[in-house]
């Protein structure tokens, strides 16, 4: 009996496409998805009993591996005395204090329930603070399913081949300007044309939602310069790369200070969580201190705060975790490139710490959305199915990142490379 198929087919009767997030349907790779039953460390198991080495990690959050003992214990302990109050708790203070005291450029922070909430709230705050309306986002970057961001977006929008999004009025995107990632001149031209109306720039400082694309430090410095010149705010979307490429996130890669930063994924320890923070003078514009209103019934939920606190504290106290992830990430990157060269495969590998994407393209480098779109989707599909059959859970999309955890070992990387060696292209 194929339990995966049975469960997924029944799911399609009750959930659109059988899923609660489109990429999980595996539509772009043409098969039914495995239905996951359990996970521990770097491994997951599906309903048919198949085990996989997991390089998806819930799309990034599980940097400590699945069911980390300290995170599980924190959740259990908190759930015995609290689930939700809709009121202030000591746990939300503990996590906020830890974040503000150990992260750069975060004087104050506001907890929310998702990355989408964090980014849309940060943009609202930027508009309220500057009294301007227009926001620059970059083609291929994904900042959640907020209407104003669903234009030339990455992630599932790109994976599913959706040119736009039905239900998003033209009015909702009229104040969204599209920049080209790593193109200084084009962004400068946007400011020359619209500068007095631009409230801010939102950017993934390491893009992960069109696959991993690194930001040129010179480009980032230009963004800071333009924001300062025109009185706009620079917003780093670190939903994916925060606590992942380094404890302090991608900010550590640039000699540039953002005005606002958004977080989610890792900081929730695997539970629904998000946050945005920044300079005190900006954050104090939020209600109840200022006129920018944002609220949430479940924001600062005690169980979520306990999972986040256990995760963030463990990462802060163990900097060697990042050394380990860098070591195995480098081994994976070098090994894949050596095999591809030997086989004559057109391949670009982009990696930052524990985020990595294999782009099947004949280009020499991938540094923007247009480069990403040159990739061979059919070859990626063959690669994906090959690796899945070899026991590896990797993203079912050319346009997503693979992730590494502290529970991945060099042996796991060796097995990945052995499997990739047998891929015929």
UniProtKB/Swiss-Prot annotation:
Enzyme class: isomerase
Enzyme Commission code: 5.4.3.8
Record PTM N6-(pyridoxal phosphate)lysine, positions in chain: 265
Catalytic reaction(s) noted: (S)-4-amino-5-oxopentanoate = 5-aminolevulinate
Cellular component annotations (GO), alphabetically ordered: cytoplasm
Quaternary assembly: Homodimer.
Gene that encodes the chain: hemL
Coiled-coil ranges per UniProt: none
Gene3D superfamilies on file: Aspartate Aminotransferase, domain 1, Type I PLP-dependent aspartate aminotransferase-like (Major domain)
Keywords recorded for this protein, A-Z: Cytoplasm, Isomerase, Porphyrin biosynthesis, Pyridoxal phosphate
Pathway(s): Porphyrin-containing compound metabolism; protoporphyrin-IX biosynthesis; 5-aminolevulinate from L-glutamyl-tRNA(Glu): step 2/2
The protein, known as: Glutamate-1-semialdehyde 2,1-aminomutase
Cofactor(s) needed for function: pyridoxal 5'-phosphate
Similarity annotation: Belongs to the class-III pyridoxal-phosphate-dependent aminotransferase family. HemL subfamily.
PANTHER family: GLUTAMATE-1-SEMIALDEHYDE 2,1-AMINOMUTASE, GLUTAMATE-1-SEMIALDEHYDE 2,1-AMINOMUTASE 1, CHLOROPLASTIC-RELATED
GO molecular function: glutamate-1-semialdehyde 2,1-aminomutase activity; pyridoxal phosphate binding; transaminase activity
Subcellular location: Cytoplasm
Chief site of localization: cytoplasm
Record-linked InterPro entries: 4pyrrol_synth_GluAld_NH2Trfase, Aminotrans_3, Aminotrans_3_PPA_site, PyrdxlP-dep_Trfase, PyrdxlP-dep_Trfase_major, PyrdxlP-dep_Trfase_small
SUPFAM superfamilies listed in its UniProt record: PLP-dependent transferases
GO terms (BP aspect): protoporphyrinogen IX biosynthetic process
PROSITE patterns linked to this entry: AA_TRANSFER_CLASS_3
Organism: Clostridium perfringens (strain 13 / Type A)
